[in-house]
């Protein structure tokens, strides 16, 4: 009979632990937090040192009663919640809500970073008490977020419109997206020209290669700004003599990346699998907590997924090296194990990187047991871990400099300089298992090889290839690049990236267009108000400083109430000034539309889901209609106007204004120019390329045509 009680967060984790611990243990799930701040009020007594007033949600009372009953029959109690601040706080709240600390039953905290037999056994052999430093760091974060959210939101409701909200980290993320949009709209493209020449050692075209112009003969960089300049240079090059000036062979070594931490897993899952951060973390949690593997039962497949440490246990490194030697051969093993112990300066407690719990459990072996998305994420984690302990990849690179001279030229320069390069894989190393998304993007940038060239070799000119280009604005953030930017600025921690990205979309401050974040008008308005009246709240530097304070609280170096006391008075002072000085905004705009029911003019309003048309006779007439933004492109089916729309999932798409009579719709942004091959509709494809929806013809766009249309800023 079970006489030892173990409490965890989820039923899946409970099932996996039950299998490991055996019948003498009873494992119960709390289903997350059992106490929280109240939904209907601030729940913080500011005047009494920021004392939180926690409540037990109605749905948790039954769970608490069940845990108390199980605890009364147990000889000992183990709190086995997740190994981070949130997990520590859940354990503490469990104790407070159930009053387990008032009983004589021994109660201890156990911590493990993977749900395996060895890790769990070690944790139960080394129990400890609840770490109040970690609990207080979580409490401080929760109260900070509550103060900002509950104090700012009423202001936005009164001064802008009902239903708006602000958050400590989310508002910084929205500001970053809004600032990037402003950069894009302010950007003025500059014309420039790239000129390449095709050269060969002989008249045989098969052995030819291309070299790019980069300077005049004395090494001064050459900037060609218009077609006339390009034509003059091209004319010079047609009669020039080409000679090899320098040949620099070099061996390039590319080292594998460390195993995943939370942010890099989210970034690579977005780049390679197109998983959102939220989806990635949900799947990773399933892999961590355990999935049924046939006769094996429920098995934890990866280590804990919220971490900012690249450290890997020595036993896992040994297992990986043994596996690599057997499967790939000793040439794929570096002489010494690779160590990735360096952590971000703000890294939380002693975590491990995200890795498989058993290297020998290869992805193909799990195919019968995991669903497709679970298998894809597991394989990504498995390959990254294995590759991290493999030999470096080796490349033979050659950089060649070529001088073009024209003795008969009367130009003031004395020729031009060109460069060509090649990179040939000599040893694939870790890349037989895993390539980063950046490596995949770089493929094809260099020719596979150059002919054997020596200094002084004369080359045969075979043609000139001038290309008009335009400088590009900074790209909009994707989930991957926004997470990377937040991490680099020290904003948020492993547990906050996914919720932040989800929240800013759910509150309609940003939309996704072709996988890139674009602010809504509502997001721009709210961000501008916060930037003007609450500059510290939306300042990335200040937010990063607050995160560092939370880290110090977790280490026991800073009092949590002191951090709140330092933050709150200036925040309240700023809030009082905003209430006094911020005028109520009228977001209503006139339109040319007439109400179909009462013939009054219709006006443009901004709601939770973006712009819409409403009758100016409200409340007498409550007619509303969707507001469609024309993009200046005709529908290929009925020649109506194509308009920008937002789907129920908050994704941008483009449809016909004659809907429902015409149901044409497409996800990619249509381009005004017709297909040069068949005159059908072109849509944005990748980067500065467009693709025909009919014949699939691809064409390179000029200037800013490839940019998504922005919201007026």
Stretches found by the model and what they are:
Residues 2-5, 16, 25, 97, ...:
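Basic, low-complexity terminal or inter-domain segments flanking catalytic cores
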Residues 141-151, 169, 199, 252-264, ...:
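Core structural elements
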Residues 115-197, 249-250:
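C-terminal or mid-to-C-terminal helical accessory/interaction module adjacent to the motor/catalytic core
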Residues 16-20, 66, 89-97, 119-123, ...:
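Alpha-helical scaffold elements adjacent to nucleotide-binding pockets in ATP/GTP-utilizing enzyme cores
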Residues 2, 82-84, 161-165, 249-258, ...:
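Conserved short loop/turn motifs at secondary-structure junctions
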Residues 218, 222-258:
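Metal- or metallocofactor-binding catalytic centers and their adjacent structured scaffolds
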Residues 264-276, 483-493:
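Short helix-coil junctions and helix-kink-helix linkers
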Residues 1-142, 151, 221-225, 231, ...:
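Intrinsically disordered, low-complexity regulatory segments
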């Amino acid at each position: 009979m079970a006489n030892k009680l173990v409490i965890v967060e989820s039923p899946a984790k409970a099932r996996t632990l039950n299998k490991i611990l055996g019948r003498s243990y009873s494992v119960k799930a709390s289903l997350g937090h059992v106490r929280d701040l109240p939904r209907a009020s601030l729940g913080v007594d500011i005047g009494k040192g920021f004392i939180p007033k926690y409540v037990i949600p109605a749905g948790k009372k039954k769970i608490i009663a069940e845990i108390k009953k199980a605890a009364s029959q147990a000889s000992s109690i183990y709190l086995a919640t997740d190994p981070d601040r949130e997990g520590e706080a859940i354990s503490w709240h469990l104790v407070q809500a159930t009053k387990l600390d008032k009983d004589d039953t021994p109660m201890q905290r156990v911590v493990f970073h993977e749900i395996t037999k060895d890790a769990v056994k070690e944790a139960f052999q080394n129990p400890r008490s609840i770490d109040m430093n970690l609990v207080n760091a979580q409490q401080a974060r929760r109260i900070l977020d509550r103060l900002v959210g509950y104090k700012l939101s009423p202001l936005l409701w009164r001064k802008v419109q009902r239903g708006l909200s602000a958050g400590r980290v989310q508002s910084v993320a929205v500001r970053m997206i809004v600032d990037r949009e402003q950069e894009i709209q302010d950007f003025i493209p500059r014309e420039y020209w790239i000129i390449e020449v095709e050269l060969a050692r002989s008249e045989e075209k098969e052995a030819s290669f291309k070299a790019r112009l980069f300077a005049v003969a004395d090494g001064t960089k050459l900037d060609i700004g218009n077609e006339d300049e390009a034509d003059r240079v091209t004319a010079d090059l047609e009669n020039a003599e080409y000679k090899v000036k320098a040949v620099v062979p070099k061996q390039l070594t590319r080292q594998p990346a460390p195993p995943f931490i939370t942010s890099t897993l989210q970034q690579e899952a977005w780049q390679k699998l197109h998983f959102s951060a939220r989806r990635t973390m949900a799947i990773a949690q399933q892999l961590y907590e355990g999935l049924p593997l046939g006769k094996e039962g429920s098995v934890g497949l990866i280590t804990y997924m919220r971490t900012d440490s690249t450290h890997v246990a020595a036993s896992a490194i040994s297992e990986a090296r043994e596996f690599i030697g057997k499967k790939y051969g000793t040439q794929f093993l570096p002489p010494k194990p690779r160590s990735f112990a360096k952590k971000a300066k703000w890294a939380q407690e002693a975590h491990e990187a995200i890795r498989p719990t058993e290297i020998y459990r290869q992805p193909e072996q799990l195919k019968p047991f995991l669903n497709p998305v679970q298998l894809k994420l597991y394989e990504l984690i498995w390959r990254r871990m294995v590759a991290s302990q493999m030999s470096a990849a080796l490349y033979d690179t050659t950089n060649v400099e070529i001088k073009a001279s024209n003795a008969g030229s009367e130009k003031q320069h004395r020729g031009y300089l060109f460069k060509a390069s090649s990179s040939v894989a000599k040893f694939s190393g870790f890349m037989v298992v895993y390539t980063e998304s950046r490596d995949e993007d770089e493929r094809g940038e260099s020719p596979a090889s150059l002919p054997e060239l020596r200094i002084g070799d004369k080359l045969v000119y075979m043609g000139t290839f001038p290309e008009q280009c335009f400088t590009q604005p900074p790209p909009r953030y994707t989930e991957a690049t926004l997470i990377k930017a937040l991490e680099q600025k020290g904003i948020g921690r492993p547990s906050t990236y996914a919720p932040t990205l989800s929240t800013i979309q759910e509150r309609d401050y940003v939309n996704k267009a072709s996988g890139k974040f674009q602010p809504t008008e509502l997001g721009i308005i709210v961000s501008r108000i916060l930037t003007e009246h609450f500059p510290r709240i939306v300042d990335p530097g200040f937010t990063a400083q607050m995160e560092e304070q939370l880290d110090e609280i977790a280490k026991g170096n800073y009092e949590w109430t002191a951090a709140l006391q330092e933050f709150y008075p200036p925040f309240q002072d700023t809030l009082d000034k905003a209430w006094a000085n911020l005028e109520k905004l009228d977001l209503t705009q006139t339109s040319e539309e007439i109400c179909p029911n009462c013939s009054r003019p219709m006006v443009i309003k901004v709601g939770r889901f973006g712009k819409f048309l409403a009758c100016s006779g409200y409340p007498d007439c409550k007619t509303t209609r969707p507001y469609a933004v024309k993009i200046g492109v005709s529908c290929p089916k009925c020649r109506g106007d194509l308009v920008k729309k937002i789907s129920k999932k908050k994704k941008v798409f483009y449809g016909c204004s004659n809907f429902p009579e015409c149901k044409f719709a497409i996800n990619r942004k249509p381009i005004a120019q017709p297909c040069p091959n068949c005159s059908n509709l072109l849509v944005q494809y990748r980067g500065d390329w467009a693709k025909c929806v009919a014949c699939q013809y691809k064409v390179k766009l000029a200037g800013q045509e490839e940019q998504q249309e922005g919201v007026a800023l």
